[in-house]
A protein has these predicted regions:
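Short catalytic-loop micro-motif centered on adjacent basic/acidic residues
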Residues: 31, 56-57, 105-109, 163, ...
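ATP-dependent carboxylate-amine ligase catalytic core
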Residues: 15-25, 50-150, 246
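Short, basic phosphate-binding NTP loop
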Residues: 1-33, 40-52, 66, 73, ...
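Acidic, Mg2+-coordinating active-site environments of NTP-dependent enzymes
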Residues: 25-27, 102, 123, 127-271, ...
């Protein structure tokens, strides 16, 4: 009871500080949500944008009501009962609000475990919301996929623009929504014209943008899932007005992170594909697809 009340009190204070930060400083917020792929997509977007902009983000999965505000101010989460640590955070936040905020873009991950939680992020007013997928993950408190879709699309109500992975979000949930689409092998705003895989060395992608422009880029991200990450990052960068040269440079900096399609050297000259971090069925299938296409020699 005390823990819950204390957390709610802190959340209210932090959220009010974020609102003040937004009112005092001009910076963009990109929020990433979805049933699967949030963290990988967030990191791909952040790495891409960092090539030409000052970007703040968090490497892990700070994505709930308490931790999301911490990302904007650059803090790690202390223990809920560490009163002095929280006091220092609140004081530091006030100083940042009054001073110079040294970032152009904040890339945030927002998550939900139950209906109604996404509405708690309305105060962020994202400039761009990225929906990675609507899938049957974390279903404990959802009646079905329709309920998941309704929840994951809530940010569309309070975001300036919405970017959706068309491959992994059923069309029936997107009817009538003003959105920007990205996907593989589909007619949508951002899509792949060609994809050439180089085994475990990466792949070459030719990307078509919303304005019809095309460009090619060599990336180390693997398989179709890796291509989706790159496509999402390219779409976000383009929507934020970054020039093509900056987009390509940023996309080339995307690297597999620990536990997510990471290539490791094993014993006796063997190679491992490490996709063990909180792997969903979709992620496991994607990793197996890469494995099956790899030359055993």
């Amino acid at each position: 009871m005390i823990k819950r009340l204390g957390k709610a009190f802190l959340c209210n204070l932090l959220e009010r500080q974020v609102v003040k930060l937004r009112s005092k400083h001009l910076f963009k917020i990109v929020a990433v949500g979805g049933s699967v792929g949030k963290t990988s997509t967030k990191l791909a977007i952040a790495k891409t944008l960092s090539a030409s902009r000052r970007v703040i983000y968090q490497d892990g999965n700070y994505n709930d009501r308490l931790t999301v505000p911490l990302v904007l101010f650059g803090h790690a989460e202390p223990g809920i009962f560490n009163i002095f640590a929280w006091f220092r955070i609140l004081i530091n936040n006030s100083r940042q609000i009054k001073g110079d905020y040294p970032f152009d873009i904040a890339v945030l991950e927002i998550g939900t475990d139950a209906p109604g939680q996404m509405e708690q992020f309305a105060y962020l007013k994202p400039d761009l919301y990225v929906l990675t997928a609507v899938a049957e993950e974390h279903m404990e408190y959802f009646a079905g996929l329709d309920a998941v879709a309704k929840e994951e699309l809530q940010p569309a109500k309070f975001s300036n623009k919405v970017l959706v992975n068309i491959n992994d979000t059923a069309a029936q949930y997107l009817v009538g929504l003003p959105l920007i689409g990205y996907g593989l092998d589909l007619e949508t705003d951002y899509t792949l014209v060609e994809r050439h895989e180089h085994g475990l060395m990466g792949q070459k992608l030719i990307i078509s943008t919303a304005t019809g422009k095309q460009f090619s880029v060599e990336v180390s991200a693997l398989g179709k899932q890796g291509a989706k990450l790159v496509l999402a990052a390219a779409a976000v960068a383009d929507q934020l007005g970054i020039e093509q040269e900056g987009i390509i440079k940023g996309l080339q900096s995307i690297k597999p992170v620990s536990g997510r399609m990471q290539i490791l050297s094993g014993i006796n000259g063997s190679t491992l594909i490490d996709d063990t971090y909180n792997a969903s069925p979709i992620a496991v299938k994607a990793a197996l697809d890469v494995l099956y296409k790899t030359d055993a020699n």
